[in-house]
Structure formats: structure tokens, C-alpha cells
Amino acid sequence: MQQAPQQQQHPHPPSSSYYTQTESELLQIEAGGTGLTFASHSQRPESAISQVASTAHLDVPSAASSGSGGSAVSGGSGGAPESAGRFVSPLQRRHCQPPSHLPLNSVASPLRTASYKSAAAVAGHGFHHSHHQQLDFQRNSQSDDDSGCALEEYTWVPPGLRPDQVRLYFSQLPDDKVPYVNSPGEKYRVKQLLHQLPPQDNEVRYCHSLSDEERKELRIFSAQRKREALGRGAVRLLSDERPCKGCEEPLSGGDIVVFAQRLGAQLCWHPGCFVCSVCKELLVDLIYFQRDGNLYCGRHHAETQKPRCSACDEIIFSDECTEAEGRTWHMKHFACQECEHQLGGQRYIMREGKPYCLACFDTMFAEYCDYCGEVIGVDQGQMSHDGQHWHATDQCFSCCTCRCSLLGRPFLPRRGTIYCSIACSKGEPPTPSDTSSGPQLRPTHRASTSSQIAKSPRRGGERERDPGRKAHHGHPKATGSAGDLLERQERQRMEAAGVADLLLGGGVPGMPRPAHPPPIDLTELGISLDNICAGDKSIFGDTQTLTNSMPDMLLSKADDSHSYQSIDKINLNSPSNSDLTQSTQELANELELDNEPVRELPHDGYEQLFANNRNQEHPAEQYDDEQLDNRPMKEVRFHSVQDTMSRSKSYTDNSNARRRRRRRNQSRSSSEMQINQTNLRLHNAQTQVGTTPLNLLNNLDNCDVASICSTCSSSSSSDMDDYVYRLPARKHYGGVRVAYVPNDALAYERKKKMAQDSSLAPGAGNASVGGAPAIMHESKNCTIS
């Protein structure tokens, strides 16, 4: 037989004489043991059966076997029933010796050659060239039923059936398993012949190196199986109703079924249910082995009695064998698939059902770590995900951003790398609310800057004005950008005042000075210009005293590690306004000590200061009114902030209204108010170059008296103070929010320019000389949004 797989496993492929002899023995066993005479069938089914049983040579020592078998091969002349002649034409009409030049199928050509030789032995040699067209197998051949030519479209048919019954039988099988000529069903049949009926289970010559004792055991084993278990199914029409043994479904009379005489005459199966009980494949050519009432193919029946070697596919007859992974091997065959080193008692790795030693497995199949690039050995732990591999260590299997270990915890694969959280996958530090994040990472540059500002030591010449001042300071959250802004504005103020000693030895030591400080983070809904000014008790004072008070303010901001927090988080961490009021009052007390000509201002605002100046300097009221007309108007300017967007609005100067607004805004964040108040104090102190009451009054006026909206040129008035409206509850829409804060540098430049322009212009009309400036009385409130 020209089977490449069989030639690789067996030194001598089965010959045509082997198939013929096997068929004869099988027929004799069934005829003599059960009374069934299959020798009466036509030569066509007989030759097909010789193809089936070719790989299952069953040695049955019987003298009657040869005679009966020879009679069967010769054409079934002995004991043949007359029913065979009704549907099978004479053999000389159906088969003849094939010509030497005819190309036969590479898989089944030896089988057909054997059948032609058998037919030629009976029919003679007179029709060698007269029926060449019959040898060209056609799937849809057309002929009458008496000729039997319709059976030639199959490579095998069940014995004892008419052509219409053959078609009825094959209609019960899947199309891909019907053995049409040159079809997938034919290839399936040949494959199952080799698999279900391995020749090495019956013939010594198909085995490799067997000892004399093992050869003897093989012959005894094969003969016993044939005698006790071998059989072939018979296909007939059912005469009565009975259930199918395979699927338990009822069968009715007239159905075509399969009988197995060794299991009992009352048991029958659908043609598609006649399968092996182990592999569930159709029993090829209806050849079966039975044991304990179950059907088996030849391979699995042999394995129920003897183990089979997984390497050579032969039955193990020796007393010793190796068992591994639920399978068995000969002792010498359990070796590495690559280097053939025997693995008995040694460590090995199974891959695709084949054993490998550790060295060969590492060489052929080891993976490389995606982090360190080293080989992951078989003795090392390995983590794998979506085609990627890592060492199972804290260093290799870790977050790509923060390098925290991911062993035993969920991870986030993204773009070929793994992360511990979504924040790390974006290159950001994890937020406190991120429960999936690992250990806290290193603080950002902004947080480091804030921490450095908060921990800076005080200057050497600082004097403690109030011993209990530290106890009144809270710990509001602040940002590093606010500290940078305060330090820069302090330097500008000191340069404007001409205090050189403070510039050389003062300030805040070690404070970084970025070229472009980040913007102040304002996260409140609305920022009132009046609220910014309302917290100041005094804008007068020595520059040194103001500098000395700054470290206390900066020290209260040391706890912040994340600059940009959500609005809700900032509000939760904000202290009450009482703490802010105490801090502002202490700053005013310090400033008052160095400014004795000016009395302490009340907490509520600047109104009493205006009244006192009117009483003391009434003769100069007109002059002050003229100065008021020449003063620049305070404007609202836009300050872009990336994270938030606030709204700003102007209020009136009435102190009672400011008290009400202060109580109404208890929940506002004190951090942003303290930042804005500090900016305003620094701006007012920076713009003051003299200490005369008139200059101080002008600076005070610039802060709050004439707050003119730059958009609609309207101002707030105390007349409409009782009608101040309240903003609705803020809804967070996301995105970028715009905040409005006074820009000190621009305000200072504009004020100087407007002062110069007004000095060149002719004097304004009705202006008082020594009194306080008059307050404008418009009745409009402006909201910039």
C-alpha cells in the first residue's frame, strides 16, 4: 500500500495479499461462528471489504479458514444463496484486469489492483481491453440496477444490499463521510482504516524491535482478540419496531439499520449511531470489537487490554513502562523529543504531547521578558498577558509609570505597557480618590515649590510683635503659584520703597523665582472686589513689618501637596471666616505700631476712615475732591486660569451689607480669599511712596471707593446696597473657567499714566480742597461673567 504515514511508522507496508487473506479470515469467522454466510456476496463488496480489513490481519489458525476463504475470494461459489444473482451481474461483466497505463488513485490503487486480480482469477483474461470505460469511476454513473454499475461510484458499500438500499444506507451518514470516489469521504475512510485498525496490533512484521518473547505474546494477543471480540455489522431493513441502541430513539419497520451479531440479534443501530464508544467515530467498514456489551474500534479495544506506547504507537508487552501525563511509554522511548536523552526519573516539560528536557525547552520555546529583555527560564515564574511576558518579580511586573509592583493586584494594559491606574497611564500622579492607585508618588514640581516656600526660615531681623500670633493662624490649603506671586510682588514693593537692606537680607530665603509663575488657582464661584478689600484692616505700615508678617502666612500653607484640587475638596478644607478675620486683625496691629499718626481702622471697612478725615481736614475738602476727579478709576481685568472659571461682581461700600455678605459667604474657600487679600495689600503698599495722610487717603480711595467696571463703565453705590442680588447655585459644567482678579502691575501703570494725564489737563470744576473725596452714586450693579 502506498501510504506515506504508514511507511514512516512500519518498516513493511501491508501488501495486497495481506488484505485478501485478512478478508478471507474475517468472512470465515463470521460464517463459522455465527451462521452468517457473507461468502455469497458479489465480488464488488468483497473486494471493498478486502480494502477495509487490510490493516487488521487477524491470525486464526484454522484449516477450514483457508478453504472457505479461498472459496469466498474465488467468487462465493460454495453455499451461495440465489438472492445474490438477482442484483449482481456475472463477474466477468463487472470487473476486468486494469490496463498497466491506467492511473489509479494513490491511496486505494493497491486495493483495487487486488480486487482486479481476484476477479481475473475467476473470469479469465478475455476482456482486458473491452471494458475500459467501466474502470473510469464516475460519481454519478448511470446504469440499470441489474448491472450493478451504480455501486461503482463508492469505494466501499455494505455487503448484501441492492443499489437502492445502498443509497438509502449512505443517506443516513454525513456527506463528508460517504466514501464517494475521489471525495473527502474516501480520504476519511482511508484515514480511519489506519487509525482504527493499526496493523502493528496484529502482525509481527509491522512492529519495530520486539524480543522473541514479545513476538510470541503479540501472536497470542491478536488471535484471542479475533476469536472473542471481532465482528462486522450487517445492514438490513428492520421488520418491526425497536429502539436504537446508540441514541435510544425508536425505529420503525422498513428503516435500514445495522445489526451486530456478537452483541445480540435484538440490538440494532442507526447507520450514524454505529460508532466506537471511545472515539465516537463511525466504525470503518462496519468492523467492530466488542467488550462488555460496548462497541470498540480495533485501536481502543486493544488499549483496554494492554497499554500503548505514545512514542511508537505499539502495544507494550514488556513488564516495565513509563507513565506520565496520563499516558504510557516504553522505558527507552520516554526521551526528549529534541536531543533524545532519556528522561526516566528526570525533570521534563510536556509540549503538544511530547516531552522535552529543560535545556532543550529553554532553547526552543522560552519567552523573553518585556521589561528586562532576559530569557524567562523554566525555573522562574512567568506572567503573561496578550502575547507579552514578564518575570514574576516586583521589578519586572510593575507599573510603567510609578514602578509599583502589580503582582497579586489588577493592572491596566495600554499600548503594550501595563499601569496600576488610569492616572499613571496618562502620566499623571494618582489623585487621593483613586483607590486603585499604588503607593503615593513623588510630588509634582508645583507641590515641591509650595513645600519649599512653607519651610523657608524667617529673616534674622524679624521681631515678634505678638507672642500669641501663631495660635490664631489656621492651615488653609494653598498653592506654590501663590507663594511665587507673593515673593515677586514683595520684591517690587521693596524696590519701590527704596528699602535696600530688606532686599539684600530679607525676603524669604531659598524661594525659587520662576520666570513665568503659574496662575493663581481660583475655584470659587464668584470673587467680589469689595470682599477682597473688606478683610484689610489697614494698608498703612512700615514695609519691614509687612515683610515680617509674610512667613506666618506662608507657613500656614505648608500642608498642600497638590495644587489643583476640585472645588468641593477645597471647600471642605477651608477654615471659617473667623480665623481669617483674626489673621487680618493681627496684621493690622503690626502695621499700626509703625504708623502712629494714623489710628487703627475698624474691622468692617474704610467708611469710618473717610468720616474722620472729613472732620479733621474739612478745609481741604475741595482740594481732595479735585484729586478725586484726577484719580484713575479702578478696573476689573481678566486673569486666565486653566482649571476653574469664576465670576466677579462689584458690591457697594456699606459696612452693614458687607457683614451680611460675610455671613452669607461662610462656605467660600478661605484659601483664595487670603490669596487675593494678600495681593491687594501688597499692591497698595507697593504704590505708596509717601506717608502723608493725603497720599494714604488717595491709595485707600483707589482700593474701593471708585470701582468702575471696565466693561460697562458702571460703578456700585451704597444707595442700592439693600438690593444686592445673590448668585444662583453654581453648576459644574467642566472645561475651562475664567476668573477675574485685579492685576496689580497693570493697575499701577494705568494709575500712573492717568495721574500724569490729569496733571497736564486743566483743573476740574467743582472739587474740594481738603476734604475726603466724594463717592459716586450710581445705582447699577455689574456682573462680569
Swiss-Prot record:
Residues 242-306, 307-367, 368-430 form the LIM zinc-binding domain. Pfam families: LIM, PET. SUPFAM superfamilies: Glucocorticoid receptor-like (DNA-binding domain). InterPro entries: LIM1_prickle (IPR033725), LIM2_prickle (IPR033726), LIM3_prickle (IPR033727), PET_domain (IPR010442), PET_prickle (IPR033723), Pk/Esn/Tes (IPR047120), Znf_LIM (IPR001781). Residues 67-79 have a biased composition (Gly residues). Keywords: LIM domain, Metal-binding, Repeat, Zinc. One of its GO terms (biological process) is dendrite self-avoidance. Residues 1-86, 125-146, 427-484, 638-679 are annotated as: Disordered. Residues 15-25, 641-653 have a biased composition (Polar residues). Residues 135-243 form the PET domain. Residues 459-469 have a biased composition (Basic and acidic residues). Residues 1-10 have a biased composition (Low complexity). The keyword Zinc applies. GO terms for molecular function: zinc ion binding. Signal peptide: none annotated. Residues 657-666 have a biased composition (Basic residues). Belongs to the prickle / espinas / testin family. This is Protein espinas.
